[in-house]
């Protein structure tokens, strides 16, 4: 009997209902466990509910010491885990050359296939990013990216393979019953609901949402996510007299239901790789407004639009998009996402085949 390929999906953020965690989770769930057996590793758990989801998939979640606060302990932990579990592949998900820390540990543990996967177009640790680039370039064996811009950011002129972000399109179909249930949960009536999905961090630019809401007195704002800026956003809402119109829903595991309750999705990011949220919102038929910092590749429908960070322009664009036929737009969005190659089942099958090919290859090549 052929043993399954052992894969460690290493994420460089706390395990939570964020895109970087959900990306490998969704793919693992679609793979054949007799062919690929995968686990996840992080340095912190932001929401314990995610642990249950991972274990339900038949995978394990390992929590290492903090990778930047305690790098030596972290590297020893990762190397030991890779060695003990005999992982064939370590697939690292991040956005900077600080991945050199993780790559060194994976190599030390004996992993011959070490995939660096770029999920963004910028990072917080710019000095470390520059200093660690030579080590990073020497340590990865394969380069993946969520899109062209993210690939060029992390790998420069070196070759990389684009692994597109993907979603379960049919699971995101607009649902009138779900819309009614979620609106009842939050005490919403007929008022338009603007939505944002993401962590409360500077890159997501959550304070800009208050400026937009302030120009749309007829609207409510539903924020799904959590993070270090939440208290600051709550304070800004109170300062502007908007607290009664903003719903802080926290991290949620039922996003398809929440999308159905919304009337527009806003992504005013300052930098972004390829936002899975934009794919999800279009599958749900939501008018989707994105900052010009977001890659154009994620706009697959005519109800996704880009605007400069001018609150007046965003407010005008939102008013233009309200009142459309959601069921029809949802059907159009799901079709566009699948046709563009962002279907989760298809991507999981391709990545499973790639994992098997990499392990069978005599020697990994860059």
Protein language model regions, located:
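Aromatic "clamp/platform" in nucleotide-sugar-dependent glycosyltransferases that forms part
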Residues: 251, 270
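Carbohydrate-associated surface elements
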Residues: 149, 166
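A short helix/loop element that forms part of the nucleotide-sugar donor recognition site in Leloir-type
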Residues: 173-187
């Amino acid at each position: 009997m052929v043993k399954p390929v052992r894969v460690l999906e290493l994420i460089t953020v706390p395990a939570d209902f964020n895109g970087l965690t959900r990306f490998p989770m969704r793919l693992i769930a679609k793979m054949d466990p007799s062919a690929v057996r995968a686990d996840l590793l992080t340095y912190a758990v932001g929401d314990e509910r995610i642990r249950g989801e991972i274990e339900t998939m038949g995978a394990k979640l390992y929590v290492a010491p903090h990778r930047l606060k305690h790098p030596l302990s972290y590297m020893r932990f990762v190397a030991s885990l890779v060695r003990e579990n005999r992982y064939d592949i370590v697939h690292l998900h991040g956005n900077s050359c600080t991945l050199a820390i993780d790559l060194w540990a994976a190599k030390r543990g004996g992993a011959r296939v070490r995939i660096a996967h770029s999920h963004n177009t910028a990072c917080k640790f710019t000095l470390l990013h520059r200093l660690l680039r030579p080590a990073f370039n020497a340590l990865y064996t394969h380069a993946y990216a969520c899109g062209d811009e993210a690939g060029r950011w992390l790998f420069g002129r070196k070759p990389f393979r684009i692994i597109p972000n993907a979603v379960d399109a049919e699971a995101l179909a607009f649902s009138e019953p779900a819309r009614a249930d979620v609106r009842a949960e939050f005490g919403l009536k007929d008022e338009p609901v603007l939505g944002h999905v993401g962590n409360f961090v500077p890159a997501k630019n959550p304070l800009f949402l208050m400026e937009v809401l302030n120009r749309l007195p007829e609207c409510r704002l539903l924020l799904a996510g959590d993070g270090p800026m939440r208290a600051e956003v709550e304070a800004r809402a109170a300062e502007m007299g908007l607290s009664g119109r903003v719903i802080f829903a926290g991290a949620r595991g039922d996003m398809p239901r929440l999308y159905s309750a919304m009337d527009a999705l806003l992504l005013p990011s300052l930098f972004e790789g390829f936002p899975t949220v934009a794919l999800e919102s279009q599958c749900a038929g939501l008018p989707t407004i994105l900052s010009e910092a977001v890659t154009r590749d994620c706009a697959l429908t005519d109800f996704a639009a880009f605007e400069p960070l001018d609150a007046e322009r965003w407010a005008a664009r939102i008013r233009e998009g309200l009142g459309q036929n959601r069921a029809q737009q949802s059907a159009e969005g799901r079709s566009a996402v699948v046709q563009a190659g962002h279907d989760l089942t298809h991507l999981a099958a391709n990545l499973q085949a790639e994992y098997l090919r990499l392990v069978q290859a005599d020697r990994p090549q860059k």
